[in-house]
């Protein structure tokens, strides 16, 4: 039994030892396993079943098809996830950004092309993709060409281990927590390459700022997330989500879920702030900073390359929202609606917060940004981790 389960049972006034003595060790163990399996299923986790396994069973090939079919089903799942989040990035991301910003600033957003202005995305895509990809003479061509693909690729790779709903997780490795942060950090290489390869001072400064910012905030981001792992006792994301399906406390007949945002709200605030800097949104958008660096590392890009970098930004915003939802908001767990719907609602809620910050909070200077990361968030994240470890050790 993990420390967090002990905490939940204590909060609900449950005495695990008495229950074990009354029922017998074996029976209590079986009952606990059954309850956990039921909670995991209700929370939309599906007991850790992956999408290839789900698709194989639906098509009548059983839970363990041969490696060739597993590869095919995995590619189908990867295509589905990529399609869902590319569409989300295009419509909820780019169109939503305009609508939300207009609402916060009391303006009228796009409303001419299609219903509610939705077809402006199609118009923008046709306009940008029909433009010539201009390659300046002095660029480092291989790095210049590769960089735009690394940014969206790293985000889509990170979604591979995110539990999106019942049977909608492409892979469920034991080290899924480590994998998702490692995959998302590949984007830093793409941003630096795009800035360096452009042979442009503004682009180079934007790339350096992006790298410095990601290093400064990646450490507190991971350290803060590690406090969730200390509580959960596992690195497997599906198990972290399943653990949040239990009731933390029941007040007047209303059960408060054991989401880690309620267990450790300080860690949630730290993680949300570090994530905001990690995805480069206001007030931490110094790598682009239009008033200072034109378009930062994207200055020399046009046409399809610009589209890839721009979509990559929004994909990373949604990946950050998915990580927040998985670690702190119960992932796909929720009543009545399917797990995938709850997951998208939570991701969009985090996205709404980033757009509020973009409209309401002014940009900080690069020196202030680095100071906040190294002297503020890093210290608080380690303090949070140590305090969490002490509490868990005391409970256990």
Regions found by a protein language model. Name each.
Residues 2-12, 40-396:
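Selective transmembrane helix interface/packing segments
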Residues 9-41:
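Asparagine/serine/threonine-enriched low-complexity, disordered tracts
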């Amino acid at each position: 039994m993990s420390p967090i389960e002990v905490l939940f049972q204590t909060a609900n006034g449950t005495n695990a030892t008495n229950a074990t003595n009354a029922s017998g060790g074996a029976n209590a163990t079986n009952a606990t396993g059954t309850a956990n399996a039921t909670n995991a299923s209700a929370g939309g986790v599906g007991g850790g079943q992956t999408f290839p396994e789900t698709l194989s069973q639906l098509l009548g090939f059983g839970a363990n098809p041969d490696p060739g079919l597993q590869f095919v089903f995995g590619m189908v799942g990867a295509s589905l996830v990529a399609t869902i989040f590319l569409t989300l990035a295009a419509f909820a991301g780019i169109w939503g950004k305009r609508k939300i910003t207009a609402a916060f600033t009391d303006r009228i957003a796009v409303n001419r092309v299609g219903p509610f202005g939705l077809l402006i995305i199609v118009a923008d895509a046709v306009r940008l993709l029909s433009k010539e990809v201009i390659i300046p003479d002095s660029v480092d061509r291989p790095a210049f060409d590769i960089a735009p693909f690394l940014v969206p690729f790293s985000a889509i790779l990170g979604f591979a281990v995110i539990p999106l709903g019942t049977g909608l997780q492409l892979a469920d490795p034991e080290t899924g927590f480590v994998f998702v942060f490692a995959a998302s950090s590949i984007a830093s290489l793409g941003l630096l390459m795009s800035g360096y390869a452009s042979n442009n001072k503004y682009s180079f400064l934007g790339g350096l700022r992006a790298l410095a910012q990601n290093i400064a905030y990646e450490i507190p981001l991971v350290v803060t997330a590690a406090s969730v792992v200390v509580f959960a006792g596992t690195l497997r994301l599906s198990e972290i989500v399943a653990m949040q399906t239990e009731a933390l406390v029941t007040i007047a007949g209303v059960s408060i879920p054991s989401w880690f945002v309620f267990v450790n709200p300080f860690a949630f605030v730290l993680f949300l702030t570090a994530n905001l800097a990690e995805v480069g949104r206001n007030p931490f958008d110094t790598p682009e900073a239009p008033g200072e660096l034109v378009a930062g590392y994207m200055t020399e890009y046009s046409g399809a390359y610009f589209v890839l970098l721009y979509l990559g930004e929004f994909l990373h915003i949604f990946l950050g929202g998915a990580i927040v939802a998985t670690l702190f908001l119960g992932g796909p767990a929720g009543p009545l609606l399917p797990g995938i719907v709850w997951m998208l609602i939570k991701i969009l809620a985090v996205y709404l917060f980033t757009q509020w910050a973009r409209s309401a909070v002014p940009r900080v200077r690069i020196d202030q940004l680095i100071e906040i990361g190294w002297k503020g968030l890093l210290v608080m994240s380690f303090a949070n981790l140590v305090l969490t470890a002490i509490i868990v050790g005391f409970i256990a």
